[in-house]
Amino acid sequence: MKKVNLAHVPAEQRQSPGGKYAKTIKEISVALGRDPHSLDLAKRHPFDLTLVSIPPGKSYCPYHCHGAESELYLVISGRGMVRDKDGTSEVVAGDAFFFGPGEAHQLSNNGTEDFTYYVIADNPRHDSCYYPDSDKWAVSKESPDYIIVRGTETDYYKDEE
């Protein structure tokens, strides 16, 4: 059995250049042995489990939908706002929600304390993301990283902040 304790999973802080997007993540699946840089299914887990914390006034990332990935969320603490095709809804500790492929969404924190949740993603090999607000695509190019295109390759945060 592979086992980790959250206290020993490294926390990684990420922030966009303009500061609109910020989060701290703990990649639990990576701590359990998933190779985040491999496309080899033997080195990947069938799903990813990540603990995410969004500070007050920030969003996780731009409004987007995945071409292949499904994501299941479970709110642990704080309050968050979830934007989807129907508008914006508040979520609180204990709430669970799901987005399948093609369902655009964005998670934000408009509260006064961190908004913390688990996300479980089914980790498909060749996912892509579409960003409706900026009409961009993130596509994989035989690597674990995405390239961002809008007719031609562009910066991830262009027209997002």
Write out the residue ranges for each language-model feature.
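A short, N-terminal "cap"/entry segment at the start of jelly-roll beta-barrel domains
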Residues: 1-46, 135-161
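Conserved short histidine dyad/triad with adjacent acidic residue
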Residues: 31-36, 50-66, 101
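Short histidine-centered beta-strand/loop micro-motifs
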Residues: 38-43, 61-66, 108-110
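Short, conserved beta-strand element in jelly-roll/cupin
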Residues: 51-55, 65-83, 121-124
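A generic structural motif
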Residues: 70, 77-79, 86, 102-104, ...
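Short acidic-glycine-tyrosine-enriched beta hairpin
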Residues: 86-101
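Ligand-binding loop in jelly-roll beta-barrel domains
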Residues: 101-127
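Short, charged, solvent-exposed linker or helix-capping segments at domain edges/interfaces
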Residues: 128-133
